[in-house]
A protein has these predicted regions:
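Short linear motifs at protein or domain termini
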Residues: 1-114, 119, 163, 212, ...
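C-terminal regulatory/effector modules of DNA-binding transcriptional regulators
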Residues: 1-3, 188-237
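Short helix-capping and inter-helix turn/linker motifs at the boundaries of alpha-helical repeat units
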Residues: 23, 121-122, 187-190
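Residues within well-formed alpha-helices
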Residues: 27, 65, 107, 111, ...
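Mobile beta-alpha loop/short-helix "lid" or hinge segments that flank ligand
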Residues: 72-77, 171-173, 187-190
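Alpha-helix N-cap/N′ positions at the starts of helices
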Residues: 81, 104, 126, 191-194
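Conserved amphipathic alpha-helical segments that form helical-bundle/coiled-coil interaction surfaces
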Residues: 93, 97, 118-181, 194-202, ...
Length: 237
């Protein structure tokens, strides 16, 4: 029987070592795209071939190709001078991203509520408790990682619905770079952990309507945090 337990410096998580089986140009592209989407590079941050090639330990050619491909996807923008910068989305575009995420995950959690196992519930609770312990120690990097793992584990429940699962994963990647800032201060991290507790409780009660309301509220709060941060950045620039 599942028991809901009582409430109790930025880094990248991927390796900079290229597996031999992956072409260099593909590896460089995937690595840089991950860094942009994870928020390792901030919107507006300048990116140069020379610096990135040195950091990745590759020649400038695959980096140049990766940057042009990212530019075609709207993730970076070429500068009038040399180099590129990480693209800045408008407030409307960011709001749309969060609204899309809310619609997808609102439906997904209804499916999850019907089929989740006791083992998965325990796993989700474990990530919450680890995040809470990290919050008590003010280990913000760990909180970010455990909260990401919470959502990864939640969506694995419906991984059999391949296309739907892929849509959710892609949307989360684009949202993540605007989400990280609220998790790197204590109040935002605490609010996120509390939101995950509410999600877990709703799922454990097997109430799909409650589940959808709770996760939509969780995403709405995240959207407000992101829009507030972007607005403050615009004022400061």
């Amino acid at each position: 029987m599942f028991i809901l337990y009582p409430m109790l410096q930025k880094s990248t998580s991927h390796s900079k070592t290229n597996p031999k089986s992956v072409p260099v140009r593909e590896w460089a592209y995937n690595h840089l795209k991950s860094d942009v989407l994870s928020g390792h590079f901030n919107p507006g941050e300048r990116l140069t071939e020379e610096h990135l090639a040195k950091a990745l330990g590759v020649s400038r050619t695959p980096v140049r190709e990766a940057l042009h491909k990212l530019a075609s996807e709207g993730l970076v923008q070429p500068l009038e001078s040399r180099g590129f910068c990480v693209a800045r989305d408008s407030l409307e575009e960011v709001e749309d991203l969060f609204d899309i995420r809310a619609a997808l995950e609102g439906y997904a959690i209804r499916l999850i509520c019907d089929c989740i196992s006791e083992q998965s519930l325990e796993e989700l609770n474990g990530f919450i408790e680890k995040a809470q312990d990290a919050l008590n120690r003010k280990a913000l990097d760990e909180i970010f990682e455990y909260n990401t793992q919470f959502h990864d584990a939640l969506h694995r429940v419906i991984s059999g619905k391949t296309r739907f699962h892929s849509l959710i994963a892609d949307t989360r990647k684009y949202v993540l770079r605007y989400r990280k800032d609220s998790l790197y201060y204590l109040d935002g991290a605490k609010r996120t952990i509390d939101g995950h507790r509410k999600i877990l409780l709703a799922i454990s009660l097997k109430d799909p309507d409650l589940c959808e309301r709770v996760i939509r509220e969780h995403i709405r709060e995240a959207k407000e945090d992101a829009l507030h941060k972007i607005t403050e950045d615009i004022k400061a620039s």
